[in-house]
Amino acid sequence: MDVKTVLIFTVLFGVISNNAAETGIESDSHDALNIGRMFCKPLDQQCNKDLHCCKPLKCRRSNNGRKYCKP
């Protein structure tokens, strides 16, 4: 691979991994950019049928009506 190809892959992968690294409710707008089930949500992050929790966590409804990843 030449330098240009490596650079393109680096930029693309950097954008994807940056979205995965963001946490908190503010990151919800970025969730659509995540590719399928490739990324899972860690403990206490919001989840739904499209945003799965990391195993062995489960998506559970909390007191405020939202769903969060819990053991």
Swiss-Prot record:
Molecular function per GO: ion channel regulator activity; toxin activity
**Propeptide ranges, please?**
22-37
Q: Which UniProt keywords apply?
A: Disulfide bond, Ion channel impairing toxin, Secreted, Signal, Toxin
Question: Carries keyword ATP-binding?
Answer: no
Where it sits in the cell: the answer is: Secreted
Question: What note about domains is in the entry?
Answer: The presence of a 'disulfide through disulfide knot' structurally defines this protein as a knottin.
Function summary:
Probable ion channel inhibitor.
Question: What is this protein identified as?
Answer: U11-hexatoxin-Hi1a
